[in-house]
Amino acid sequence: MLPSVHSRVLAAVALLVFVPMGIEAVRASRNERRQLARGGVQPPDDVHRVMSIAYPGSFLAMLVEGALRGAQPLLVVAAGLIVFASAKLVKWAAIVALGRSWTFRVIVVPGDSLVASGPYRYLRHPNYVGVVGELVGAALMTGAIVTGPVALLGFGFLLWRRIAVEERALLGARR
């Protein structure tokens, strides 16, 4: 028996979410080692550990809700795909602009200059704009009308805390 269209959509969403996430994790880990070897400093109040659970957990919860909720209108799935893909482009543009400085953790190497190219010319934190867009897109694609907003609120709070930590660390490095 062939899997339903809904099952195939959810499988495609899972691949769209978790394959790039794995690639990003490998790149971030490699860059973290490089940054620390160059004398990088991590602030003690970073929320990385919680984010590293909440981020994939949010997508997983949305996929489970989507499986339980059933098929979504194709137009909503398509809109979610467009939002997700656009967000991924913004995020990857930020990753490319940061180069070897991009990590999952806040690591500041004393003496490094602030990146002001790519999307950083227009946005202070384009990577996080991309992350929020990924969550919105996934919520639309899966029909996660409960876990989507909950994930956005919860992860939004974590991002707010993370940005504060990052700003303090960057300000301290420029002194």
What are these regions (language model features)?
Residues M1-S4, D45-V76:
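Long, highly hydrophobic alpha-helical transmembrane signal-anchor segments
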Residues R8, E24, R49:
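Aromatic-acidic/polar surface patches that form glycan- and anion
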Residues A11-L15, P43-R49:
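Alpha-helical transmembrane segments of integral membrane proteins, especially early/N-terminal helices
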Residues A14-A28:
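N-terminal signal-anchor/start-transfer transmembrane helix
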Residues L15-V19, I53, G57, I82:
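Hydrophobic alpha-helical topogenic segments used for membrane insertion/localization
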Residues V26-V47, G70-R175:
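Cytosolic-biased juxtamembrane loops and peripheral soluble domains of multi-pass membrane proteins
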